[in-house]
């Protein structure tokens, strides 16, 4: 899932036979990154330290926040936020690695937290 800086969906891709929940999880990872301005790995760390805060924000986002690795902010070479990528389908660490690789392949900067 690719979101713009407002968290509007720009693109979503999935393979045949994949649960539609994967897209929702990927969206939640990217949405969380946009909402709080940090990659979802940093959000996972914050959730461990401030569970009530993350739970409250998740409520404000109507449950569309998944604070585990795989939601990565996209920045241009000047540091301007372009959006976020969210990936789900493997381990969270591998999801994050795939997002970072895709962003780098586009010549942009990835921010995982």
Q: Where in this protein do the model-derived segments appear?
A:
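Flexible, solvent-exposed loop/hinge segments and secondary-structure transition points
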Residues: 1-113
